[in-house]
Every structure is written in structure tokens, then in C-alpha cells.
Design a protein with these regions (language model features):
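A conserved SF2-helicase RecA2
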Residues: 302-307, 523, 531-569
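Flexible beta-alpha connector loops of hexameric P-loop NTPases
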Residues: 212-220, 262-272, 335-341, 424-428, ...
Length: 572
């Protein structure tokens, strides 16, 4: 102290036994800052849970429970105490609440020095279900893919192109088992929180407490605990949405991106990154394979696979030789000619009723939230718009509000024009809430669940609604694009698309690609059990090449035609 000229302070406590951001993530932040033209601090901040970010006002309490620790074998005063001690010996660190003996008995044993009741930290588990499941036998095609990827001992990107129901998840699970047996870890990503419960259930059933979950719907405490479990090397697998790509795993042996084509993998706020790009950087760092899986790969990924940049693996058939669903296009122009102005065509209404009568389930896709798309004044032709985003406000009947789907600005619904004061206004368009109401009014035996952002806002909302549908508490699932990917319900034999033209006509050069992906994915939800699946797609343009490719399940033809269009227009 005299030499340095200042006083040393005593270290009271070490805050973190291990740094929250390891050397790899710090190197990754440098790379991201350069690639995205962002500051390094913003890149580092997006890697941390919100509870650990500077200026965060949220506090997280550490959870404890009392457990019984066995110390030594000594003769006790009563047979009851001896019986309790023997039980405690067989159940190390038994929680007091789970002990079949009274607290009086335990306190007497503790006074004699045979046991000690201590406080132990416990982690909050976001998913409590504990269903154990063994590996399923792989088909020859699945086994070929697994063997091919396991032979890779260096960085390589694999594009796993498998039709819906071809068993890609089983490939992920068995690859993960082999990687864990080598003493390495696995990073598994899905594009949306909606898909997390099903993927978590699959991984938890095989690997139990070795799995951690990371996504934004976890509570502050759960997310904090899961992050600490990863930092402390207590887990071997991390399953999560886009942000899970920054999980502080060590010794990564495999990185998987399911539904790699999904737009949700792109971070729209600063720093703007592509999850696949970050995953490939981490794959290079750890010298491990990166698997990009999809039934409808992005054109960029498929093009790279054909050029040899990625390694292409294919699963062209469903497991157990199950046929793909038959798809029928319903021309809504013909429906109008026959004076049917309903939301559903006559054919689709008949098919829904037949499916319900057979005690089978239905899934209906309408990629539009709310009840009505907008409100128009019939006197002055004014449309009510968001003052911040300049887009029309959507009517939500359940909350009786007009809401902006970009910034969530909302005002109470008043049937009056804000511009001229006229009450001669009309709600135009249809959303999931309107379809839900229509089904309940027109099908007497319909038990409907609506599955969109609005119905799943609360914690565990996704899990609860999907569990109810899986348990057949409802027989119709109506939803937005959230129902299109990754869901596996064996009793669903009919899928209906209310309006295929919604995404086909948006002003985006990727409109064709996204429409094909959405329709092919949602079609794949049908017929995943023992019964043949059927799909009906309502459209005003049934001869469009995208819809014809969907009808024939022909990805190669779609790829060929769409690439020709992009090359002519000089699109990416």
C-alpha cells in the first residue's frame, strides 16, 4: 500500500464465479460490430438476458428450499426416528416438503446430530412435464443423414431438406445424443416461441434436466436461472428462439436451426443480424457442423447447397411411407358466380362438417389478426389510420379497440368517422377473430381455439392452447402463420386456407417464396397420423404457378421458376 500510494479494499464477495460473456462471445461481438456497422456494446447487450443488462430495473430473487442432508449413522431414541433416518439415507438432499415424516421427528433427529436441515438454491423450471421417451428406430434415409453428419469433425454447413412429416426432429434428437456422448453440447433453435413447447417436449423427453430453454416468454426468474445453468455448465442442450444463438455454451459439437427459411430469424432492430450467419460463425469457432433444416428451404440456402457451399441432405418421403396430403384449389371467383359471398366456400364448409362428424380435427389458416382489416367511412371515404405508422388500424372485437399491428397504438372503437363525424362507416375485411365467430355460429359441434399473437400474450399461452388442442378439448384450430410450422397433431386430417392471395399480392420480391413456404408448411400439418390428410386452399387465382407447385408438392419446380423470375428482374 505504501509503495502504490493508495489503500487496498477487501473483496467481500465474488459476484460471478464465471464471466457471463465468455471469450468466444466477446470475439463474436467484435465480428458482429464489423458486419452490422453497430457499436460493440450494443452487440454485447443483445447477448445478455434483460435482467443482466445495465440500467435494467428488474430484480430477480434467488429461490431456495429446505433440504435434508445426511451426516452420520448414530443410534436414535425411537424406532420412528430410526425409520426416518434410513429413509433419508436412501434419498440424499431430500426436500423437507417431500419427506413423509413430520417436522417434529426431523428436528429431533437434527438435534442428535444425524442430519442437518439446510437451505439449498433451486432453479425455476419453465416446463415441468417429465415424460420419458426412447429413441425411435430410424428409416434408412434418416440413418444415412445421421451417419453423414456424424462423420463431420470440422465446420460444415448441412442443409437438411425433408418434406413435412419426414422425421427431421428425430434426426435432430439422435444427432444430439451422439454429440452429448462425445462430451460436447448442442444448440437447437426454432424460429418462433410458438414452436418452442413442442421442441422442448421432444428434447426433455430424451434428455431431461440436461436441457435449458431460452426465449422471451419466460419469466424474469426462469430466464435468469436458465442462463446461469448454462454458464455453470449444468446443461448439455439449449433449445430456444432467435436469441438462443448467443447461449454461452462451451464445447459446442452441433448447431441446429429448424425451419431455417423463416423470416423470424432476422433481427430487425439494431444490431441487425441473420441468425444463420451467427450460427455459422459459432460453428467455425467450435469446428462443428451446422444443420439448417426445412421442408421449404430459402432460395438462398438451396442455391448454396446446389453450388456446393452447403452440403445437401434429403428426406424426400414421410416416415412409414405415409402419403403427403391431397391438395385441392377452390376458385372463389366461381363461388361468387354462384352467389356465395361467404367467408368459406361450399366445398370447405361441407368438408369441415364431415371431418367434425368423424371426430377428427381441423386446422384453418388466415394470416390476418383481429376481426376486420380496417374501418372506412362511406360518406367521405376516409380510413382510420395510425398517427405514428400511417397504416390502417385493425378492429379487435374482443377488446373493442382499433389497433395498429406495428406499434400497438390503440384507441376505443367508436362507430363514427374521425374526419367528418358521419356514423355511416363500415368494417371491411376478415381476421382470425371473425373466422372464430363464424365457425361457432355455423357449426353446432365446433369447439374452436384461436391461435394468434393476441390469444397467446400471457405466459405459457402457447403451451396451454396447444395442449388443449392436443387433448382434443377443441376440434378446430384457427390461426395465423403460427399454426403453419412444426406442429404435430395426429388427429388433424383436414387443413383449410381461407385466403391464399393475402401473401401472394404483397409488394415484396419474396412474396412468391413466402407464399409457397407458408402453404406447403401448413399443408404438412394434415395427415400426420394413420389417416390420409386433405387440404383445401381458397384463392381467386388457382392457376398461379406458386399454387400449382404447392398442389403438386413440387419444390424443385418452384425453385426453378422463381429463380428464373429473380434473374430476369436482377433480384437477389
Amino acid at each position: 500500500e505504501e509503495e502504490k500510494g493508495f489503500r487496498y479494499s477487501f473483496i467481500i464477495q465474488i459476484i460471478d464465479q464465471k464471466p457471463l460473456l465468455n471469450k468466444e462471445l466477446q470475439e463474436l461481438a467484435k465480428y458482429m460490430a464489423k458486419q452490422t456497422l453497430s457499436t460493440r456494446i450494443s452487440c454485447l447487450q443483445c447477448m445478455l438476458p434483460i435482467q443482466l443488462k445495465p440500467k435494467s430495473q428488474k430484480t430477480v430473487g434467488i429461490k431456495y428450499e429446505k433440504v435434508i442432508s445426511f451426516i452420520k449413522e448414530i443410534p436414535l431414541k425411537t424406532p420412528k426416528q430410526q425409520e426416518a433416518l434410513n429413509y433419508i439415507k436412501e434419498h440424499p438432499l431430500l426436500p423437507v416438503k417431500d419427506c413423509p415424516y413430520s417436522l417434529v421427528v426431523l428436528n429431533n433427529i437434527e438435534k442428535q446430530g444425524a442430519i442437518q436441515i439446510i437451505q439449498q438454491e433451486v432453479y425455476r423450471d419453465p416446463y415441468h412435464e417429465n415424460i420419458q421417451q426412447n429413441d425411435f428406430p430410424l428409416t434408412p434415409m434418416q440413418q444415412k443423414v445421421v451417419n453423414e453428419i456424424l462423420l463431420c469433425h470440422d465446420f460444415q454447413t448441412y442443409l437438411l431438406h425433408g418434406v413435412t412429416g419426414s422425421g427431421k426432429t428425430e434426426v435432430y434428437l439422435q444427432l444430439s445424443r451422439h454429440i452429448i456422448e462425445q462430451g460436447k453440447t448442442v444448440l437447437m433453435m426454432v424460429p418462433e416461441i410458438a414452436l418452442t413447447p413442442m421442441m422442448v417436449a421432444a428434447f426433455k423427453s430424451r434428455f431431461g434436466k440436461q436441457v435449458a430453454i431460452l426465449h422471451s416468454k419466460l419469466s424474469s426468474g426462469e430466464r435468469y436461472d436458465e442462463y446461469r445453468r448454462i454458464v455453470e455448465d449444468e446443461v448439455k442442450i439449449v433449445v430456444g428462439a432467435r436469441s438462443a444463438v448467443f447461449a454461452p455454451l462451451e464445447k459446442i459439437g452441433l448447431i441446429i436451426m429448424d425451419e431455417e427459411h423463416d423470416a423470424s430469424y432476422k433481427q430487425e432492430s439494431n444490431p441487425r443480424y441473420l441468425t444463420s450467419q451467427i450460427a455459422r460463425w459459432r460453428g467455425k469457432y467450435h469446428e462443428c457442423p451446422v444443420v439448417l433444416g426445412s421442408a421449404t428451404p430459402s432460395l438462398e440456402s438451396y442455391s448454396r447447397a446446389l453450388k456446393g457451399v452447403y452440403h445437401l441432405c434429403s428426406l424426400p418421403k414421410r416416415i412409414n411411407q405415409k402419403p403427403l396430403p391431397t391438395i385441392e384449389m377452390i376458385d372463389m371467383v366461381e363461388e361468387i358466380k354462384h352467389h356465395n359471398y361467404d367467408l368459406l366456400s361450399n366445398k370447405m364448409k361441407t368438408k369441415i362438417q364431415e371431418t367434425l362428424d368423424k371426430n377428427e380435427q381441423v386446422m384453418l389458416l388466415l394470416n390476418k389478426r383481429g376481426y376486420a382489416s380496417y374501418m372506412r367511412c362511406l360518406s367521405c371515404d376516409e380510413v382510420l389510420k395510425c398517427p405514428h405508422c400511417d397504416v390502417s388500424l385493425t378492429y379487435h372485437k374482443d377488446s373493442k379497440t382499433m389497433r395498429c399491428h406495428y406499434c400497438d397504438y390503440q384507441i376505443p372503437f367508436i362507430k363514427k368517422c374521425s374526419h367528418c363525424g358521419s356514423t355511416n362507416v363500415k368494417l371491411i375485411g376478415s381476421g382470425t377473430q371473425k373466422i372464430e365467430e363464424y365457425l361457432e355460429n355455423n357449426f353446432l359441434n365446433a369447439r374452436v381455439i384461436r391461435y394468434d399473437v393476441d390469444s397467446t400474450r400471457k405466459k405459457d399461452g402457447h403451451h396451454e392452447l396447444l395442449k388443449r388442442f392436443e387433448n382434443q378439448e377443441a376440434n378446430i384450430l384457427v390461426g395465423t402463420q403460427m399454426i403453419a410450422k412444426g406442429l404435430n397433431f395426429e388427429n388433424v386430417t383436414f387443413v383449410g386456407v381461407i385466403n391464399a392471395d393475402l401473401s401472394l399480392n404483397i409488394p415484396d420480391f419474396r412474396a412468391n417464396e413466402r407464399t409457397y413456404q407458408l402453404l406447403e408448411q401448413v399443408s404438412g400439418r394434415s395427415g400426420r397420423g394413420k389417416k390420409q390428410g386433405t387440404v383445401m386452399i381458397q384463392t381467386y387465382n388457382p392457376d398461379h404457378f406458386v399454387l400449382q407447385c404447392v398442389k403438386n408438392h413440387d419444390y424443385q419446380m418452384f425453385y426453378k421458376k422463381e429463380m428464373e423470375i429473380r434473374q430476369l428482374a436482377k433480384y437477389p
